[in-house]
Amino acid sequence: MQFKKLTEQSLAGKRVLIRVDMNVPVKNGVIGDDTRIRASLPSILHCLKAGASVILMTHLGRPTEGEPKPEDSLAPVARRLSELLAQEVKVIADWQAGIDLKAGDVVMLENVRLNKGEKKNNEELGRAYAGLCDVFVNDAFGTAHRAEASTHAVAQFAPVACAGVLLAAELDALGRALEAPARPLVAIVAGSKVSTKLTILEALADKVDQLIVGGGIANTFLLAEGKNIGKSLAEADLVGEAKKVIEKIRAHGGNVPLPTDVVVAPEFSENAEDTLKNVADVTRDDMILDIGPDSARVLAEIVAKAGTVVWNGPVGVFEFEQFSHGTRTLAEAIAESKAFSIAGGGDTLSAIAKFGVTDRISYISTGGGAFLEFLEGKELPAVAMLAARA
């Protein structure tokens, strides 16, 4: 996919409008995690260094359009950004009449979700945003799967529309992983439900050499292979779909390596007693909460030989120590592998952080829903608009 990049633009003396994703957790005016704010810095600093003035826009939470409340304000975000940039960043609520800026200034439009028509991708609002700038930059991969005025309409009407540092890196990494992957391509798709990831499983079935499934998804696949899973979380009504995915992968020489040994417990709790069992020995009162060491070893060997690894979801209840070993083994194997690795999704990122391998994953995706939709092969509207403007 071709699109213009911020790093290729001439910016001196220009007004640059950047759609960032600074939707951070805020409680009583205090930011809980500023990762997304820091992730936006490369694009902002690039513009400032080039002699531009910068206008930022982002959403925060889920406010009601046209009804501003104090808790919906970006003031805490602007404060934190001011600290990181070591310069004042003002929040501008009344920007429609224009903004007075000089080179080196950074300002932030108030929460875009307060603007009427934002979520409906209103053309008039998009034109109003576009009228503020010489160059529009989308640097918010996390919202790329939504067509909204601050991600889509604005890109249609701005004089120039391009991808920021973060978005360009994200698209390059995803393209490298899925559009022209080094083989073997190994995908790890785990989670509690097949139903939420079924379209991803179906889309990947045509592409991957090995599809590793985990969690409730693996239990449904074990059912599809005629195994007893006791009272484990699974979706019996989707066994047919699981069988189709397995058949599809095996038809082109790929495989779905299912666990041969598992860690079970009588209940789902932090204090549940864990027991290692062969899959064939699972009884009706067992809950499968992790893969066993033999299965983990097999998966680690698959990952070691991979050319590309795409990881979405832990293979066990890693939050509980006794059920964390499968995910730990897998995380460490990915970290040690020479493969190009990309990981995304909240639980996956938590697992990566817990096991201390963050710096050894080739690329960590910032987008939850957008990452999943890219895996599904869906067009991301905000990215498609950048491509149309290239």
UniProtKB/Swiss-Prot annotation:
Compartments it resides in: Cytoplasm
Reactions accelerated catalytically: (2R)-3-phosphoglycerate + ATP = (2R)-3-phospho-glyceroyl phosphate + ADP
Principal subcellular localisation of the protein: cytoplasm
EC number, as in UniProt: 2.7.2.3
A GO MF label: phosphoglycerate kinase activity
Gene Ontology biological process terms, A to Z: gluconeogenesis; glycolytic process
Gene3D superfamilies: Phosphoglycerate kinase, N-terminal domain
Subunit structure: Monomer.
Similarity remark: Belongs to the phosphoglycerate kinase family.
Designated name of the protein: Phosphoglycerate kinase
